[in-house]
Design a protein with these regions (language model features):
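Noncatalytic, beta-rich nucleic-acid-contacting surfaces in large DNA/RNA-processing enzymes
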Residues: 1-394
């Protein structure tokens, strides 16, 4: 508003009209109505040609993301409060964000991976231990304690996060409440008798590892593959069936899932793999190709050519960026900012728009505020299991 008054001769009332136009959902149309008045005011003050156009374009672009100072104060307060909670109570902070989904910039997978990197133990759903939503539970795992100076230890010695049954694909909040209220359950068949679940819902719970609280014939935790086998049959053995008429409840001995297979199962069933980020299982191959982790980039000098790889979490092309596109890649150690020029985006458009994970070669840039960016030169798809689509913004 002050700039419109100073450089374009707007009155206070006209400047307020400009403010309202910038805040409007129909911003482009309302801004266009004020454009000629703005240029006339600029010309009266000797500002013409390319300079006048540049001033207007910057102002119009600001309308896409700008907000008043009072809003920025509120935002700063939220940022401070969030930072305080994450520092002092990282497990509770993570659980609260998971329970507020869908929301915000980061997916549940990114939120849980960040919590794990800060020393928080995140546990998969468990039919008898989980509530409907994410909860906190005592963690008794041994190890060194918390060091305030080391963010990777902030969650040590504190509670663990237990994912809720509501996080399982196809369950939903109402059914999750019913399941949680009915705890404990004796076995898979007991659940099927007491809660009306479809075959797909039973199999989703089994795939998520929620039946690990039950035991196999040898007393060990029920393996996921055997749980999936039994879940389909159990879904047919509901309260309206006579006991013993449904076959298949007792699964044969099946090979157990390895860590990679459990990670894929977690991502498919809940979108969250707390014990295994997808790139973790490719690290030996990535290392052999000279691909750096997000953490390792901190020790690479400015201007060096680097290779990075990860799951695409975000794509952004702000109106103020002159066509430049920004992507975030996530590996098992953190996030990498990748910048794509118009030329690079055009050359690799098909891959950049469709691939869920990427391997990127580019130049590393160290900004003055400590942020690292990789300016991309070459891009190729990376084949990994991905739990959710990227969150894309303009």
């Amino acid at each position: 508003m002050q700039m419109a008054i100073d450089v374009a001769g707007f009155s206070a009332g006209e400047a307020d009209q400009l403010r309202q136009a910038m805040a409007s959902k129909r911003s482009e149309r309302r801004m266009a109505e004020l454009r000629q008045r703005f240029f006339d005011g600029l010309a009266a003050n000797g500002i013409v040609g390319d300079t006048a156009t540049a001033v207007w374009e910057k102002l119009a672009a600001f309308a896409n993301y700008g907000f008043p100072e009072s809003h920025s104060v509120s935002f700063a307060y939220l940022v401070y409060a969030s930072s305080w909670l994450k520092h002092h109570h990282p497990a509770a902070f993570c659980a609260a964000l998971l329970n507020a989904q869908p929301m915000g910039f980061y997916s549940p997978q990114s939120l849980t991976q960040d919590a794990v990197r800060h020393g928080v133990r995140v546990r998969t759903p468990d039919l008898n231990a989980s509530g409907a939503a994410a909860t906190l539970e005592t963690s008794t795992e041994p190890g060194p304690g918390r060091d305030d100076a080391d963010p990777a230890t902030w969650g040590r010695g504190g509670p663990a996060v237990r994912l809720g049954v509501g996080s399982v694909r196809g369950i939903g909040s109402d059914l999750a409440d019913e399941i949680a209220t009915g705890r404990p359950y004796a076995d898979i068949a007991d659940l099927a008798r007491r809660v009306r679940l479809s075959t797909a819902q039973m199999e989703s719970l089994a795939t998520a590892g929620a039946f690990g609280c039950f035991t196999d014939v040898d007393g060990s935790p029920l393996p996921r593959r055997q749980a999936i086998w039994s879940a389909g049959a159990a879904a047919l053995a509901g309260a309206d069936r006579l006991p013993g008429v449904v076959v298949g409840l007792d699964a044969p001995r099946l090979p157990g899932m390895d860590e990679w297979e459990e990670s894929v199962a977690d991502l498919h069933s809940t979108g969250v793999a707390p014990d295994g980020h997808p790139t973790r299982f490719l690290r030996d191959d990535l290392d052999a190709r000279g691909v750096s982790t997000a953490t390792a980039l901190r020790d690479v000098p400015d201007g060096a050519t680097v290779r990075v790889a990860g799951v695409v979490t975000h794509r952004q092309r702000p109106a103020t960026a002159s066509g430049v596109t920004f992507l975030n890649l996530e590996d098992e150690t953190g996030l990498v900012n990748v910048v794509y020029s118009i030329g690079c985006w055009t050359r690799f458009r098909a891959v950049l728009r469709s691939a869920a994970a990427l391997e990127v070669r580019g130049k590393l840039e160290h900004s003055s505020d400590g942020v690292l960016n990789v300016v991309a030169h070459h891009v190729s798809p990376l084949r990994v299991a991905v739990g959710a689509r990227s969150r894309d913004f303009r």
